[in-house]
Swiss-Prot record:
This is UPF0231 protein YPO3414/y0772/YP_0271. It comes from the Bacteria. Belongs to the UPF0231 family. InterPro entries: UPF0231. Coiled coil: none annotated.
Amino acid sequence: MDYEFLRDLTGQVLVKFSMGHEVIGHWLNEEIKGDLVKLDHIETAADGVRGSERQWQLPGHEYTLWLDGEEVMVRANQLDLDGDEMEEGMNYYDEESLCLCGLEDFLLVLKGYRAFITQ
């Protein structure tokens, strides 16, 4: 899972991830947007589920984050749409709408993100 933290001309932080993990970057850009309190909340929740069978979720406007003792899932809320709502022959391209990664790797990303936005 490769990623980079960037700043645009206005100074806003943008996060880009490698193929297969793009949704984590979209989630950080759309749902977190540099909110350190939200990062604290997620890291506290991760500590609470680490090594257990418990799960935790953080629904957002565009994406929902799920944590369990070993794994993280970021999923676009649009994937909750019922297939009956679509025209016949149409389907969603969801490669950039769902991602799984290890909890420890995800926490390293959040640590790097926090360091980048506070520098």
